[in-house]
Design a protein with these regions (language model features):
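Surface-exposed, charge/polar-rich loops and edge strands
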Residues: 1-215
Length: 215
């Protein structure tokens, strides 16, 4: 409830301020330290439920559960499809003429939530912040214009690309929140394929993959 105090590990405390319509809360942390410092001290790596349900987090997770592309703080989960990539693999792909581009999406806690509504239209998606700069958008559009294909690595990248795409299948610069919910029947505009991992039943990401498969 608003006004409740929450005690975290490492002597970190916060007061519950506001509950939002999507179920999230705004917390006010005590003390003068930046919230990023407090989270680093008291937080734990938010492993996916299929891992966290089998074991506790350990020190190695901080390195292992991080992609080679990670550059900015803000996401509460790693885009796990990208964990398969290494500098050596990227170099090998480049030698065959396969390029890559990067974008930023701060994955939110909603990525862990199952769909509980009987009708998917009633499911409330959590908004996530993302950014695609103009130069990246231009290069991505040029790939298709020259007969190439765009393969999204992970549902994270796919959601942001589709949020930035217009009905004429062009990707535009994007800087803001997206709450896109892709379900069967959706017409994809930005991508030609997807590389992804397995997904849990009744999850929004499972529905996204079903939409891409035409089911």
């Amino acid at each position: 409830r608003p006004g409740d105090e929450i005690a975290f590990p490492a002597d970190v405390t916060a007061t519950a301020e506001t509950r939002h319509h999507d179920g999230s809360w705004t917390l006010a942390f005590g003390g003068d330290e930046p919230v990023e410092v407090l989270l680093e001290r008291a937080g734990r790596m938010p492993l996916p439920p299929y891992i966290a349900g089998k074991r506790a987090t350990d020190a190695a997770d901080k390195q292992d559960y991080q992609t080679m592309f990670a550059a900015r703080d803000g996401a509460v989960a790693a885009p796990t499809a990208a964990l398969h990539f290494t500098p050596d693999l990227m170099a090998a792909l480049a030698e065959t003429g396969i390029g890559h581009e990067t974008l930023t999406l701060h994955v939110g806690a909603g990525t862990f939530l199952p769909v509980k509504a009987d009708d998917t239209a009633d499911h409330q998606m959590h908004a996530e912040w993302g950014r695609i700069d103009a130069a990246t958008a231009d290069r991505l559009n040029a790939v298709r214009a020259n007969g190439g294909r765009l393969i999204a690595v992970g549902t994270t990248s796919l959601r942001l690309l589709e949020s930035a795409a217009s009905d004429d299948n062009l990707i535009h610069p994007f800087d803001g929140d997206t709450a896109i919910f892709i379900t069967p029947g959706y017409r994809f505009k930005a991508i030609d394929g997807l590389m992804t991992n397995f997904h849990l039943p009744k999850s929004t990401l499972f529905m996204l993959v079903s939409a891409l498969m035409g089911r």
